[in-house]
Amino acid sequence: MRVLKKILWFFVALLGAACFCYLALQNGEKVSAIYLVVSAICIYVIGYRIYGRFIAFKVIGLDKNRATPAKIENDGQNFVPTNKIVLFSHQFAAIAGAGPLVGPVLAAQMGYLPSMIWILVGGVLAGAVHDFLVLFISMRRKGRSLGEMIKDEMGGFTGGVAMLAIFGIMIIIIAILAMVVVKSLANSPWGLFTIAMTIPIAIFMGIYMRFIRPGRVGEASIIGFILLLLSIHYGHDVSLNPTLAHFFTFDQPTLAFMIMGYGFISSLLPVWFFLAPRDYLATFLKMGVIVVMAFAILFVAPDFLMPKINYQYLDGTGPVFAGSIFPFLFITIACGAISGFHALISSGTSPKMLENEEHALFVGYGAMLAESGVAIMALICACILHPGIYFAVNSSSALIGTDLVHAAKVISEWGFLVTPEEITQLTKDIGEQTILSRTGGAPTFALGVTLILHKIFGGVEFMGFWYHFAILFEALFILTAVDAGTRTSKFMIQDILGNVYKPLGNIHNVWAGLLATIISVSCWGYFLYQGAIDPNGGIYTLWPLFGVSNQMLAGMSLLLVSAILAKMGKKKFLWVTLVPAIFVLIATLYGGIQKILPYKEGAKIQNTVSHVATAQMNKKAIKKLEDEIASIKSQKQQSSQEDQIKFEKQIQEKEQQISNLSHSWFGNVLDAVLCIFFMLTTLLVIVSCIGICIGKIKIPLKESPYVDLNSLNAKQV
């Protein structure tokens, strides 16, 4: 039997390698997306079965007889032993936000091959390792947060600085995720109704699994899934009824307050009551759509229309995002391969809910592989589109304009022939008014889903349904990361406040938790609301910093794990974390340096990427406009009454331009300052890690004492 298993695993590996090589080496012919789906499945299965288990049992030594914090601290609020399937769902729902949907779509401008390689290789060797090991070290330290662990294991000063940096990054990430949800649900009664219905459904599931039928996860799953499908179905009916639709139609500022209230309340409720069952419910939809997409691709067999490698954009001149393939492809893909945000979840809610140590492999490593699979689906959705359509959707109006004929002409001149009629027909098929410059990645993913699923379910008549269903799916996909992120940031704030006044750091204290939640929601809520009322303010100011800061956080997390492995006497296994850490940090710090370079004449890409250069150009443009206004005012004094009206209008237009440029200048200066702070923090963690690994810095290991699970169970009985 063992021989047969080895033969089976060998053929799985061989199949995955064959498909991977075919995608990499094929030239000049159309390539089916089937090869990427098969290759990804094989690589993930082999990665989990061999590399994941190697790390779990050879490197760190998971012990099923060792009690977890959830068992020891079980308080029914934050520390709750949770079924591993339910906890996997929570972890996946919490980490799988906008990143795996948006990043690969944007990166597709460079072709499918570079993104495919990084998503698959990075996901297995970097991202899944990162999530799993951070979950492990937090579990072994009573579920402590990332910043607190850096403080304990790498020194007070390093930890204190890191805690501030991590909190800043966390606020940026939550506000960005919330903004994506607000934009998706604004004036969308179908989407808002469906997402609103998941709240009572999740609460019912939580009560059902804890009190009505304890442990009956399967029963609750079936009931919850049926109710979810009904809410999706009736959400469409609600959107078609003017009276009902009115109650679920809100603008962005109102939705911003609603999301803040949602995040505030959900972070205070017991995890078994709402957070865990809601994430479990959301995972049904998330995983369901991804699995259906995988089978649909195998059935429809769409071809990649995007080139394997878009050589003309490797230098960073692409219309979708600026920056060369290294480092900005890796920074742009972000969560699809590795994400620092995951470390915050893996050291926030999840380690406090693990029922058994051995579940950490499935929850940590497995959930990241699932997210990497989502990124692969997003990449496929982008690359099966006609390149002309892809660039019409993802290029800014500043590049292609708002006129259909002009946009088609510009894109065709780039080498991707597309006609206005083709764009018009697709726009009509999905029931939209325009698809030009629908940037951000989400509409492109929705288009890809539509083009695949309509060939199996419903035909052309159902393209509008599938498009709007995909938009709804993305909103639900992302919202789960907001509530988990808020709860995690609450723990982080309590860690910081606990250093000032110890009782505030007690996570069992209701009032301390309430204060921390208010601070958390106030911070990310401010940026969210400002972004909702001003397209140039709030979170839009910090948005460009997301990619670099997120990857820096991932690098810092891997360095922390490396330092702990060295203290555990596992130096021979340091390559497991140091190899991905070194690659991620080189790419990220190089990208960070490019973002703070000064203006250079003729260096178009550098000036576009750099916050400092952009701020300098903003200042120069403001000075020019101020001089022009002074000149116009001088002319106005000597002009007729009729000309004065004309001059006044010109002055108002230029003052508005100055206002917009001032917003941009402030945002870029703030981004540059924060980027420098995050890079200095990263360098501080690097120095501490090196010192610990070579024995120059001696800080004792702060692992929690061993508690035997069987003895604990006997005492509790």
Residue ranges and their predicted role:
Residues 20-26, 31-32, 79-141, 152-156, ...:
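Membrane-interface helix-loop-helix modules in multi-pass membrane proteins
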Residues 30-49, 107-137, 147, 192-198, ...:
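Extracellular loop-to-transmembrane helix junctions
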Residues 153-171, 366-373, 439-441, 460-470, ...:
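Loop-to-transmembrane helix boundary motifs in multi-pass membrane proteins
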Residues 42-52, 166, 173, 231, ...:
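Selective recognition of specific alpha-helical transmembrane segments in multi-pass small-molecule
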Residues 206, 210, 226-257, 265-267, ...:
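Hydrophobic alpha-helical segments and their helix-loop junctions in multi-pass secondary transporters
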Residues 1-14, 46-101, 283, 324-328:
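Membrane-interface "cap" regions at the ends of multi-pass membrane proteins
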Residues 53-80, 106, 120, 129-158, ...:
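Flexible loop linkers connecting adjacent transmembrane helices
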Residues 240-241, 386-454, 536-537, 592-666:
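Low-complexity, proline/glycine-enriched hydrophobic segments characteristic of transmembrane helices
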